[in-house]
Amino acid sequence: MSQYLIRHNEPLEEDELVFLQKKEQRELKQYYRFFRILMFLSFILPFAGTWYSASDGNPDPFTPGKFFAVTGILLSISGFVTWVGYRRGPGKLHYDITHRTKTIEQTHISRKVYMPQNNTYHFYLNSPNMLSIEVNNTDYHRMKEGDEVNIEYTTKAKIYLGYF
């Protein structure tokens, strides 16, 4: 049994592409919600600081320079956080959709596990990308440890698509 990593890219099938597009829509919706919350806080927190300063008896709680400096810093932090969040989440998914490729990796079964709690069957793999996959009853009993299995996942986002 060879332990070399064998993988290649193939084009996405139509149903896989539709699945990824729906997943991208859901992730973008969450991303934009998070973005709006950060932008809202970037403008509200300086006002809250001004109100707090006024409640302490400060005769001139609002100074435009300080207000815009704090707002600018918060906007910069929010912008950086949302950019990193996009690059790590929806950005990778968008890359996979636009390039329309998936990776097929040839790996071997290192261990078979039955989970009686939820009546599922799993193969643990020798793959650096997937630790385990859920399989059906037939494949679980047909294949044995050391057998070769091919797994499919998106190239950049590493979203599991199936096995054969």
Per-segment meaning from a language model:
Residues 1-33:
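Cytosolic juxtamembrane N-terminal segments of multi-pass membrane proteins
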Residues 14, 19-21, 95-103:
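N-terminal topogenic membrane-targeting module
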Residues 22-97:
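Alpha-helical transmembrane spans
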Residues 96-117, 150:
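Structural detector for short beta-strands of small beta-barrel domains
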Residues 114-126:
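Short aromatic-glycine-enriched beta-strand elements
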Residues 114-116, 132, 140:
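Short acidic, S/G/P-rich loop/turn micro-motifs used as interaction or catalytic elements
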Residues 126-135:
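Short, structured beta-strand/loop micro-motifs enriched in basic residues and often containing a Trp
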Residues 135-164:
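A membrane-cytosol interface segment of integral membrane proteins
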